[in-house]
Design a protein with these regions (language model features):
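Residues forming the ATP-binding cleft of Hanks-type serine/threonine protein kinase domains
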Residues: 74
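Basic, Lys/Arg-enriched alpha-helical interface segments
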Residues: 1-51, 62-69, 79-81
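Glycine-rich phosphate-binding loop
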Residues: 54
Length: 81
């Protein structure tokens, strides 16, 4: 599932990056913790991130019901603010 904010952020991404990011997000449904993913520290929530070049996808995982919730998508310099 996608937060509304994540959908808006995706619409502002460069068109050259969009297919790569969409493909990476799609792969999360099969493997929510792919190689290179990292659990984020300093948050009360169980948040993870994947890297796609200079872009990041921040998401949460609900293992009990097998749902990946996309929280934020953006350039690495902006995503953690």
């Amino acid at each position: 599932t996608f937060k509304k904010k994540a959908v808006k952020e995706m619409l502002n991404l460069p068109s050259s990056m969009l297919p790569k990011i969409v493909n990476s997000i799609d792969n999360l449904s099969e493997n929510p913790r792919p190689e290179g993913s990292k659990k984020l520290r300093g948050s009360d929530e169980d948040l993870w991130r994947i890297r796609i070049g200079n872009y990041r996808v921040i998401y949460s995982i609900k293992d009990s019901i097998r749902i990946v919730n996309i929280r934020k998508v953006g350039h690495r310099k902006d995503i953690y603010n």
